[in-house]
C-alpha cells in the first residue's frame, strides 16, 4: 500500500510572522478548500482558503476569545459544518485550567456569533478530567454526531462520543470513552487525542487521531469502526505520519484533518507539526483509496 508522503513545500501555513497555527479542520466548498484553524497569538479561531490545499490566503478571524463569559479566555480547536444556509461551529473554550465545548453560527462563514452564553458540552465524569475539547461533528440523517477528546487540559487522554438532534443539547454515549490508548502500542502508549472521523461506504467510519508516545512526542494514526463507536480496529501501519528529525515537525505531529479527493484518486491530510514551541501546518498525501488493506489481508490469514 502506498504511504502518506509529506509535501516538499511544508509547512503550508504558519510562520514566525503569522505565529503558531494548529488543530485544523479542512472542508471543500464550491471547488475550494476551507481551513478552519486555531491561531494561538490571536487566541482566536480563524479561516483561510485555497485552490489546491497547499497555497493559502491571508487568514481571517472567525471567532475571538470572550473572557467576560468566564470560560473563554482562549478559544481554539474548532470544526465548522455548513448545514443548509447556516455555518455551524463547535469550538473549545478554555479558562482557569478547564476546557469546554461551545457553539457559534454564521450566515457567511466568516463572521460567527454566539447564540448561547454557556458551553454545550462540559466535563462531567471522572474520566473526562478537567477538559472536553477537539470536537469533530458529522450530520447524518437528522442527527449530529460528535467525537471529542477529554482528560487533561494540556493534552487530553481519551476520545468520546455524543449525539444531538439540534447540535446544542448533547447526550453522551453510555459506553464512553469509546477510544483509548493501548499501552502495548509504543506510538500511543501514553494517551490518544484529537481526531477527525468521516463515514465511508467501503470502510465504515474512518478515524485519524493523535497517538502520544509520551507527552511531548506525538504522531498521526488511523483506525476504523463499523458504527463509529465500537469495534475499532487500529491500523498495523500506525503511525502513518511521524516527526522528521531536524525538520519543522521534529518533535510532534498533531491533530489531523483529512479528506478523499476523488478527482485525483488520493487522500489529502493536514496536521500541525511542532519543533520546540513553534507549531505550523503541514500537508501529506497518499495515492490510491486503500487504507486498511493490510488489516484485511491479516484477518484473511494472507
Residue ranges with predicted function:
Residues 1-302:
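Carbohydrate-active catalytic/glycan-binding domains of CAZyme proteins
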